[in-house]
Curated annotation (Swiss-Prot):
The lineage of its organism: Bacteria, Bacillati, Bacillota, Bacilli, Bacillales. It is found in: Cell membrane. Pfam families: 60KD_IMP. This is Membrane protein insertase YidC. The gene is yidC. The keyword Transmembrane helix applies. A lipid is attached at residue 21 (S-diacylglycerol cysteine). It comes from Oceanobacillus iheyensis (strain DSM 14371 / CIP 107618 / JCM 11309 / KCTC 3954 / HTE831).
Length: 252
């Protein structure tokens, strides 16, 4: 678990290093320097711009279409991540039994703990690091989407539905928070490991309310184009979670 956490932290640091060297207010163009701009940001910006051109400069619709396209592209990785998480949840009771069995901190006991833990993983076909690959792939893409939307000048000059894409909106942040809450609530409904772990249950319940509020508040201060991206992504995730969890919820 620590190794997995370390990988995620390293990825966040790498993504921050790649994207942090670029001013978020600097427009993205074909001539923008750096690997981050060339490989990640500009291709997304180019795609949004060209899709908008198909729909008579409809940048709002283009953001929705590109967001759904990216989410569909990454859906197999999301499914893999969720299945890996469910597999880990199912073996949690046995894993806790092993941990209670070897409470001593001496080297010999810790070696036995590690050995039995690995045997449990192998017996149940669980790879504790399997959930890292989807995160490794997805995070740079999502950050690139953020940069592309914020740094494509044409987006801010257009409107969509009732809002100006370049200015903050007051309805989209509420929708963003609402669908973030729904998505997390659906994920929690099939998390069986929480019942045997009160501490984890408390943490998840806190995050259930804190995360939507944080994202909703952030959306109030960003251009509506970014909030539209978040709302679209969150709605997709709600339907994806329902689709993946449907067999599991039916069993209950």
């Amino acid at each position: 678990m620590r190794k997995k956490f370390g990988i995620i932290v390293a990825l966040i640091a790498l993504t921050t290093l790649l994207s942090g060297c670029t001013e978020i207010n600097e427009p993205i163009t074909p001539n923008s320097d750096g690997i981050w701009n060339t490989i990640f940001v500009y291709p997304v910006s180019w795609l949004i711009t060209n899709v908008a051109g198909v729909f008579n400069e409809g940048y709002g619709l283009a953001i929705i279409i590109v967001t759904l396209f990216v989410r569909l592209l990454l859906m197999p990785l999301n499914v893999k991540q969720i299945k890996s998480s469910k597999a880990m949840q199912e073996i949690q009771p046995k894993l806790q039994e092993i941990q209670k069995k070897y409470t001593s901190k001496d080297a010999n006991t810790q070696q036995k703990l590690q050995q039995e833990t690995m045997e449990l993983f192998q017996k149940n076909g669980v790879n504790p690091l399997a959930g890292c690959l989807p995160i490794l792939v997805q995070m740079p893409i999502f950050v690139a989407m953020y940069h592309a939307i914020m740094r494509t000048p044409e987006i801010s000059t257009h409107s969509f539905l009732w809002f100006q894409l370049g200015s903050p909106d007051y309805i989209l942040p509420i929708l963003t928070g609402l669908f973030t809450f729904l998505q997390q609530k659906l994920m929690m409904s099939t998390n069986t490991s929480m019942n045997s772990n009160p501490q984890m249950k408390l943490q998840m319940q806190i995050m259930l309310y804190v995360m939507p509020i944080m994202i909703g508040v952030m959306a109030f201060f960003f251009p509506a184009a970014l909030a539209l991206y978040w709302v679209t992504g969150n709605i997709f995730m709600v339907f994806q979670t329902l689709l993946i969890n449907k067999p599991m919820m039916a069993k209950k």
